[in-house]
Amino acid sequence: MDIQSLIFLLMDLAGTIAFAASGAIVAIRQKMDLFGVCVLGVCTAVGGGMMRDVILGQIPAALKDPKYVAVAAATSLLVFLIFYFKQEFFESRVRVYYDLVMLVMDTIGLGIFTVFGVKAGVAAGYMDNTFLLAFLGTLTGVGGGLLRDVMAEVPPYIFVRHVYACASIAGAVLCVWLYRGFGELPALVIGSLSVILIRYLAVRYRWNLPRISGRNK
């Protein structure tokens, strides 16, 4: 395995771990049992990629290579055990830790999986289709989290929190442009970092899209 392939593998696993952890935390907050925590963690980690692969007419990568499901399940189990044996510690700080960990895990997963969605589209032969590549990147980035929130019966994170899906779209478009001009490695690294930066700035400066609050009724 060359250095570039190793970097991509580590990024892919990091995104899997981050999204699995976010799914497990949501499940714990919804008071699901161990099985529910693991299922939600796995679905969050591989859900977006499976949706992408179905659109591309391919067997989902998570089914062809079980390491992603295994890593997601192991991460979910570890998160469950940490919360289980440190219940008193986390209960006293649940809101602070929940928001912080969700922000970090979701942001990392979003950045990495967005560019890997673009990568999958390029590998499938759609380098010239900017719209499709951006769509695949965004779907891969937000799909797992959307599935997680629907299964947990909570308002989808991508619709109610600081700029989220828009960060994924921007990162996907940038990734496509970098792919064509500078190659795969710069596109994936810079593209993922751009998503993470936009998410950080959105939270730091409270960027939100307009919404109807109901006060004008």
Where on the chain are the PLM-derived regions?
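Glycine-centered tight-turn and secondary-structure capping sites
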Residues: 44-48, 140-144, 148
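Alpha-helical transmembrane segments and their membrane-interface boundaries
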Residues: 1-46, 50-130, 157-163, 168-217
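Alpha-helical transmembrane segments
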Residues: 150-157
